[in-house]
Amino acid sequence: EIIKCDWSSDVCSSDLFFFQTSMKAFAMQQISFSQMEYAGKKRVTSRERFLGEMEQVVPWSVLLDALTPYYPKGKRGRPPIGLERMLRVYFIQQWYGLSDEGVEDAITDSQALRNFVGIDLSRESAPDATTLLQFRHLLEKHDLTRTLFARINAQLEAQGLMMKEGTIADATLLPAPPSTKNEEKARDPEMHQTKKGNQWYFGMKAHIGVDSQSGLVHTVTGTAAHVGDVTETANLLHGEETDVFLDAGYTGIEKREEVQGKQVTWHVAMKRGKLKAMVEDKLKALYVKRERLKASIRAKVEHPFHVLKNLFHYRKVRYKGLFKNTVQLHMLFGLVNLVLAKKKLLALHAQGAS
């Protein structure tokens, strides 16, 4: 027999309250068990290790100071998510190559990510995709990733990790979707086609200027893929370098109008065919030795690209247009610099703590 209850009565109301309270307590107990189990596990995953290192090397206060004047104060409507929490979510997106929706799912699924962001799912949910989209639009509107990139580099320079005596310049291709099967029935008009070797690419280029001593990126620009590397060189110099190292694709740079008057020594790789055609003698041996030395210095420019493409999984453009993608590149290379300087920064952090 089903017992019907008038929930307006004191007895049934108290029973309902007891039931609801018991269920909440049970849920909280279940969550605490999972958190205890997570905290008690012995093995530290690579993700936990990386997030722990980034917790220490990211100059949080400096970056937050740069963003605070632009972040909504929440005087009307729903209170905004805290700025530091939003920045942490945004960094997770860059580190792991996630979409806006993917970040929300990853934080919900991963206790390590929730700990890094500071979210307790028993009290709140992860920031949704729309919230992250609005934050990205804020960064784009005020060109704030360029500011964050500069702030990170200023911190690295202040700690003696960026010498600015020499620059290595290089570029990498970033493919864009070539298909016209979209709402506009057209490809991105700001992206272009170029040929490298025997293969054609459609997309853009990321050009970087790298400190020849540390291998850290000091300048970032973005162009369409068909723009020649040599034409962007002048924009990759900070003005304080005395030596510039370039591969053979930059041959003739010293003759270009935009670099006239710059007090630098150009170290451009000799083309392989020219070196190969030389007579085998002592002079060629000297040239070979010199080219190997230049190549060993230029090799440092590959390290930022390695972190970008293999660690951050950024191998193709994420958005339409050069501006939005260049905005992201500034943030990505700022974070790349922190990864490259990680060991030295952690050592300095340990010295400061002792």
Give the positions of each predicted feature.
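Single conserved hydrophobic/aromatic residue that forms the stacking wall/gate
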Residues: 1-15
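Short Gly/Pro-enriched turn/cap motifs at secondary-structure boundaries
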Residues: 3, 196-200, 295-296
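Charged, often Cys/His-bearing segments associated with DNA-binding zinc-finger transcription factors
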Residues: 14-61, 68, 347-354
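Polybasic low-complexity intrinsically disordered regions
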Residues: 18, 26-37, 83, 92, ...
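Helix-centered, glycine/charged polyanion-binding patches within enzymatic domains
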Residues: 32-37, 242-243, 248-323, 327
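A positively charged, amphipathic N-terminal helix/segment that binds anionic biomolecules
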Residues: 51-65, 70-76, 85-101
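Structural motif
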Residues: 76-83, 198, 320-329
